[in-house]
Amino acid sequence: MDDRATTSRVSVLSYGLMVLGLAVLLVSTGPGADDRQGAVESSWIRAAAADDDPPPSGKDGQETDEPILGKDFPFEGPSERWPPRDRTPFPGRYADARHQAGNSRQADEAVGRALRWLAAHQSPDGRWEAGGFHHWCDGKPSRDEQPIDGQGKPLYDVGVTGLALAAYLGAGYTNRGDHDFAKTVGRGLKYLKDVQDPEGCFGPRSTQQYAYNHAAASLAMVEAYGMTGSPIFKGTAQRAVTFITQARNPYFAWRYGIKPGDNDTSITGWMGSVAMSARTINAAAIESGKPAPLVFEDTPIVDGIRNWLDKATDMETGRVGYLQRGTGPARPAGLVDRFPPERSESMTAVGVLLRIYGREHPAKSEIIQKGVKLCLDHLPVWNVIDGSIDMAYWHFATEALHQVGGEAWATWNDALQKALVDTQRRDTDACRFLGSWDPVGPWGPDGGRVYSTAMMALCLEAPYRYERVWAGD
């Protein structure tokens, strides 16, 4: 090739790159930069199709020298500035709707403190460490020589990362916008992308409990995709959903592993929750005149869940069993006496929630009404002595009773807020305890303080996190 032609092509390429750089700079910093973020993201994705990490703009959670914890901001998300143009799958998470959800000011402030505590203890690689969260403060190694109790087990890092992200998303915070949590959420989502295997499973499968890690991580990734519509997350979310559908037992539900043959209500509650979020995302797209973005067959999953619940439910009492009808909720070895299963209706709460998601009307279903009564007979009370604290139960029952609505929901939510608002840690600062909940309960030793804080934040977000299936009926 002629040297002059080569030089000319290099010059044209250099000029083109310079113009592109100036254009990106103007888009990133000029007037209306936030509104143009989606266009920048799309062009970046086309230019780097082989590497779908978040775009290097700083708006989607990239590392910067800025501290993670910023000003002591009010409990507000970016949603006033970026109202959804289409039907959003989770409309209650936008600030205007959130304020109308009826949550108390104290509950909203508690959520804000919890999210600040979680941000303080995120690891630089984006994860939350169930057992090592205390090593980090504001994105840097902690200099605090005093121990922080509440460590969990490292094998649950992927799961508690998913729960922490779900808490941010539930309050309306994604990796986009100029709020103080954008980088926190972006780093967490990138971590999950990095630990997903080719089959779609998040994290290692070194223990049978990996299904819980996958479910929690999937919930976060699927909802992040639903809230942003970003192609950065679409493939990861699709693979996560595909793994869940392929792991389900034919005609029934889930247990540990892929189509293991047996079922349990606990992991079915988590997997079913992801499936319902995926269904909600598809329904919102269809309502906006767009094709369903996730490849997902809803009917077989709903039918399989109902088949399992019918098999596991005592039709006389409404109580749902763990592995079979008549069995109580699971407890870790050595903690059965400390946390008696009969003081929790966690499996019943899962049953109520999933039946409503399966389009059973709470006012017309006798079995749902029986389950609701059992939950109301076991209201949340922060009693560290009697072994009744079960955060997994509180989480599922809160979601279930919110779906039921009416007096049942008012009774439950009143008890829940009394149990949680005053027991949130208010001492020290966010780099130690401020904003967290002590990991009391049967699963505290596994998930630790990150688990307890994320789960209790999710409970307090329930009034606006999901729409009611039977709203208006």
Feature map (PLM): residue ranges:
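Sec-dependent N-terminal signal peptides
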Residues: A5-P31
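Preference for long, amphipathic alpha-helical scaffolds in soluble/luminal domains
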Residues: T29-D473
